[in-house]
Regions:
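Short, low-complexity interaction segments enriched in Ser/Thr/Pro/Gly
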Residues: 2-3, 30, 77
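Membrane-proximal N-terminal amphipathic helix
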Residues: 41-68
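Alpha-helical hydrophobic helix detector
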Residues: 17-33
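N-terminal leader/signal peptides at the extreme start of proteins
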Residues: 1-11
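Low-complexity, S/T/G/P-rich flexible repeat/linker segments used as non-globular hinges
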Residues: 111-127
Length: 127
């Protein structure tokens, strides 16, 4: 039977290695989840920007058609410029956002955060 010195406290090597292995496993599980959350947040932000572009379009179209005394095609053109323009700059939708309208799709993209979202959208028809 061996006597231990008084005040000699500490962890054994096996205990330290066990803790490091457990931390490694937790990190291996948590890090991918974190990146998935970042991608999901970026896509949700892109979804909100695309929806905002469509809302701007609809508001401008309604305002021009109902209150501006313009024809339907003039109101459509004004709404396109308001919501999409030729190449919207970052100040209109926040930092680094690009909103495009092609065919029947509105796409919001932000390369800095990696978010992209596309919404199907059809313009009102003019008679």
């Amino acid at each position: 039977m061996q006597k231990t010195k008084k005040g000699q406290l500490g962890f054994t090597l096996i205990e330290i290695i066990s803790v490091l292995v457990i931390l490694g496993i937790l990190a291996a599980v948590a890090v991918p989840k974190y990146y998935d959350l970042q991608k999901e947040a970026a896509d949700k932000a892109a979804s909100a920007v695309a929806a905002e572009a469509i809302a701007r379009y609809n508001m401008k179209f309604s305002k021009e058609l109902l209150g501006g005394g313009k024809t339907c095609s003039d109101a459509l053109n004004a709404a396109k410029i308001e919501a999409f323009g030729n190449d919207r700059d970052a100040a209109d939708y926040g930092t680094d956002w690009k909103v495009t309208y092609e065919g029947s799709k509105v796409t919001a993209t932000n390369e800095a955060i990696g978010g992209t979202y596309t919404i199907d959208f059809e313009e009102p028809l003019c008679d």
